[in-house]
Amino acid sequence: WESGDLELFDLVEEVXLNFY
């Protein structure tokens, strides 16, 4: 993945963990 995608993935993963 590109750097931007990795940053977005990290953000989504963090939000998902907080969501669950």
Curated annotation (Swiss-Prot):
<keyword id="KW-0539">Nucleus</keyword>
<feature type="domain" description="J">
    <location>
        <begin position="18"/>
        <end position="20"/>
    </location>
</feature>
<dbReference type="GO" id="GO:0031965">
    <property type="term" value="C:nuclear membrane"/>
</dbReference>
<feature type="topological domain" description="Lumenal">
    <location>
        <begin position="1"/>
        <end position="20"/>
    </location>
</feature>
<keyword id="KW-0472">Membrane</keyword>
<keyword id="KW-0256">Endoplasmic reticulum</keyword>
<keyword id="KW-0238">DNA-binding</keyword>
<dbReference type="GO" id="GO:0003677">
    <property type="term" value="F:DNA binding"/>
</dbReference>
<keyword id="KW-0812">Transmembrane</keyword>
<comment type="subunit">
    <text>Interacts (via SANT 2 domain) with SERPINA3; the interaction delays the formation of the covalent inhibitory complex SERPINA3-chymotrypsin, but does not alter the catalytic activity of SERPINA3. Interacts (via SANT 2 domain) with ITIH4 (via C-terminus); the interaction protects ITIH4 against in vitro cleavage by kallikrein. Interacts (via J domain) with HSPA5. Interacts (via cytosolic domain) with ribosomes.</text>
</comment>
<keyword id="KW-0492">Microsome</keyword>
<protein>
    <recommendedName>
        <fullName>DnaJ homolog subfamily C member 1</fullName>
    </recommendedName>
</protein>
<dbReference type="GO" id="GO:0005789">
    <property type="term" value="C:endoplasmic reticulum membrane"/>
</dbReference>
<keyword id="KW-0143">Chaperone</keyword>
